[in-house]
Amino acid sequence: MDCEVPAATRYPLLQLLNNYQTPQRPIPLPPAWAPKKPRHNSENDSDLLSPTPPQSPHCPWTIQTTKYTVEVEALTLEGTKVQLRLRL
């Protein structure tokens, strides 16, 4: 036998509200938020990477790698030094 206790007995402060009615069923929780997965082109990402980058005669560049970083350094024709450090 299922005996339900009135809401006013379980929660006496609800008596302070006028015309309060206990919901028939609990309100469902919103769905968990998750970031959308990025869409990729049909090409495989590994096809886009070159194991050894081509050397440009106009703007030579160097690459240095460590266990957790990749560094690219180039010198433009104007003499500007460009450095890029990617931390993995």
Swiss-Prot record:
GO BP, one annotated term: symbiont-mediated arrest of host cell cycle during G2/M transition
Residue span of region Disordered: 21-59
Any Pfam family matching the protein: Pap_E4
GO cellular component, as recorded: host cell cytoplasm; host cell nucleus
Compartment(s) where it occurs, according to its Swiss-Prot or TrEMBL record: Host cytoplasm; Host nucleus
Keywords carried by this UniProt record: Early protein, Host cytoplasm, Host G2/M cell cycle arrest by virus, Host nucleus, Host-virus interaction, Modulation of host cell cycle by virus, Phosphoprotein
KW Phosphoprotein (keyword) present: yes
InterPro entries according to UniProt: Papilloma_E4
Origin: domain of life: Viruses
Processing and modification events after translation: Phosphorylated by host ERK. The phosphorylation triggers a structural change that enhances keratin binding and protein stability.
Other remarks in the entry: The major E4 form is first synthesized as an E1^E4 fusion protein from spliced E1^E4 transcripts, such that the first few amino acids of the E4 protein are derived from the N terminus of E1.
Assembly, per entry: Assembles into oligomeric complexes. Interacts with host CDK1. Interacts with host SRPK1; this interaction may favor expression of late viral transcripts. Interacts with host cytokeratin components KRT8 and KRT18.
Function: Contributes to multiple aspects of the viral life cycle including viral genome amplification, suppression of suprabasal cell differentiation and egress of newly formed virions. Induces host cell cycle arrest at the G2 phase by associating with and preventing the nuclear entry of host CDK1/cyclin B1 complexes. Inhibits cellular DNA replication by preventing loading of host replication licensing proteins MCM2 and MCM7 onto chromatin. Within the cytoplasm, associates with host kinase SRPK1, a splicing factor regulator, and inhibits its activity.
Record family assignment: Belongs to the papillomaviridae E4 protein family.
Listed name of the protein: Protein E4
